[in-house]
Amino acid sequence: MNLESDKRQSAQSELDFSPRGEARKVGRQEVESLPAMGEPESPANTCRIMEEVCERDNLREALQRVKSNKGSAGVDGMTIDDLSAYLKEHWPVIREQLLSGTYEPKPVRRVEIPKPDGGGVRKLGIPTVLDRFVQQAVMQVLQRQWDPTFSQHSYGFRPGRSAHQAVAQAQQYIVAGYGWVVDLDLEKFFDRVNHDKLMGQIANRVEDKRLLKLIRAFLNAGVMENGLVSPSVEGTPQGGPLSPLLSNLVLDELDRELERRGHRFVRYADDSNIYVRSERAGQRVMESITHFITHKLKLKVNESKSAVARPQERKFLGFSFTAGPEVKRVIAPKALERFKQRIREITRKVKGVSIKTTMEELASYMRGWRGYFGFCETPEVLIALTRWVRLRLRAALWRQWKTPRRRRAELIARGVTERLASNTAGSGRGPWHLARSKALSVGLSNAYFRSLGLPSLFGTC
């Protein structure tokens, strides 16, 4: 190793991991005082990937990503806020462990969250903050190398690709006459990935034995649940930055098989839809691909959730499609029900918190929901949902006001005539019925809710 290379390695081991934007501001003088880096030392081949993982720019990007993703602590209790200070003190040792192949990840912390469709729970494995940082640094390097080689039909967890693009591609297949879908559901995919099979796929792309050992260590790190650590014999736990990339690598073999057979398909992570022209063709594809997945990939197809059907009868990434000559994207019924259920949960809180707090929570949820489901082509549904949210709020505020005296006073204060306010306040009708009344439409108008920050799901409806 020459003198210049020695200087670069010394600089790498002394990286300044001070938190950006915190007590210390990085100004011109401070930047100039950082160790001179020179040009990045790029590995000549896949035998030296760990050197690229430990490059300064890659590490800074990894730190920024881990911080922006936030997330809870792992088994060691270290939080995101603690990470920069920890790295500042311990980075030289950590770097040496990574480059010598002796870094040992800690077990992941088991967390269970309800599935959106109410069908049980999804098990997550939360790595420690430090392990997330290392995984992120590894993932960035491998993603740059692997992603260009992945199938054009794969859309999940890939830079520059999205669920919206996947749904639009599915729509194009339907418009082109492929009116039947083979909807494949992989049973507990992330929990059942075969480690030996996966490591073989990685070894076909990576020669750096240190990296192979590190990835194997992450896979075998174990799971801590209720204070006890269980060994990990299969699966890539959801919750770590590396898991989505590894899942794409596993299923790239499925993509290539479908391409080899000439199928029209779309895959987003473990959601795969294959589009064919007839039900009979779909049944043949289902049988043969299930055999391939079971015997070649060592995975299991969930037969109860998989089906050959019309696209209008299935959902894909929260959307479905209309029948008829003009195929439109629509929001799947379960997604609509989940939206309403969440709105009910938020508006029930009006009784115990201020309307401002409720509005902030509603606005945050509705903007996020609109950002994704606004991709539908049925604006009338979005308009109806916005009106429904306002009705929920009117009913909730009516309950909050409780007594006829207060209800009358609140309505008058909001511009309702005394006579109409008195008649409405004395009504024996329930809150949901009165939410549609003229008095509440005037006193709690659309403009009033807009002034409180309530967004619309479509335009200014």
Which residue ranges define each predicted feature?
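Non-catalytic terminal/accessory segments
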Residues: 1-461
